[in-house]
Amino acid sequence: MGRFRGSITKQSRREGINLAETEKVQKYLDRRPYGPGQHGQRRKGRPSDYSVRLREKQKLARLYGMNEKQFRNLFEEASNVPGVTGTVFLQLLERRLDNVVFRMGFASTRRQARQFVGHGHILVNGKKVDIASYRVKIGDEISVAEGSRSMGFIQENMDAQKRRRVSPWIEMDQDNFKGTFSRLPAREDLALPINENFIIEYYSR
């Protein structure tokens, strides 16, 4: 499974969840709560246990914009860490720099966050980091580079973020275009429409 680069709205309809986590895509899903294409509204037969687990794995990987190799490697790492594997796995996903940039509201989607990171618009503890998969640590300060703060996209995103609830594991200083990753998110903090146990079962088969 490579990284999906097509329409995020169409892919969200196929997976049945809001992969972009934006109001725009959610409104579209509310209007068309079925798969894309001329056969999207047809009732399908009961899926097999394998296909249910495969689809759950694909949904989570696409939600975070990862290819199969990245996703599998991260899962294997989570499996070797003490604790609840599913929760540890989700925490590792949440610690990706592109995801933290998205959570802080600097970018409107994770896809846009990856672009911002890759183009050098994001700093970690005052230093430029251009690797989307960089793992953010507790206490790290993430900020927008001084020269990038006047960009129209970033200004619009920050204005929109002021109207939304900030993730409880993040402390924001929106006026100064920065935030701190203050703690690991608990499972109940993450409103993800995902059953991570299915993913554990998929990789354990």
UniProtKB/Swiss-Prot annotation:
Give an example GO cellular component term for this record.
small ribosomal subunit
Residue ranges of coiled coil: none
Ranges for the region named Disordered are 1-51
Instruction: Cite the S4 RNA-binding domain residue spans from the record.
Output: 95-170
User: SMART domains under this entry?
Assistant: Ribosomal_S4, S4
SUPFAM superfamilies, alphabetized: Alpha-L RNA-binding motif (SSF55174)
Q: Which CDD domains match?
A: S4 (cd00165)
Any idea which UniProt keywords this protein has?
Ribonucleoprotein, Ribosomal protein, RNA-binding, rRNA-binding
Source taxon at top rank? Bacteria
Q: Specify one Pfam family.
A: S4
GO function term, MF aspect, one:
rRNA binding
Q: Which PROSITE patterns match?
A: RIBOSOMAL_S4, S4
* Database matches in InterPro entries: Ribosomal_uS4, Ribosomal_uS4_bac-type, Ribosomal_uS4_CS, Ribosomal_uS4_N, S4_RNA-bd, S4_RNA-bd_sf
List this protein's GO terms for biological process: ribosomal small subunit biogenesis; translation
Q: Where is the composition biased (Basic and acidic residues)?
A: 12-33
* rRNA-binding keyword on record: yes
Described by its record, this protein's role is as follows: One of the primary rRNA binding proteins, it binds directly to 16S rRNA where it nucleates assembly of the body of the 30S subunit.
Family recorded in the similarity comment: Belongs to the universal ribosomal protein uS4 family.
What is said about its interaction partners and assembly?
Part of the 30S ribosomal subunit. Contacts protein S5. The interaction surface between S4 and S5 is involved in control of translational fidelity.
Q: Spell out the protein name for this chain.
A: Small ribosomal subunit protein uS4
Q: State the species of origin.
A: Deinococcus radiodurans (strain ATCC 13939 / DSM 20539 / JCM 16871 / CCUG 27074 / LMG 4051 / NBRC 15346 / NCIMB 9279 / VKM B-1422 / R1)
Q: Which gene encodes it?
A: rpsD
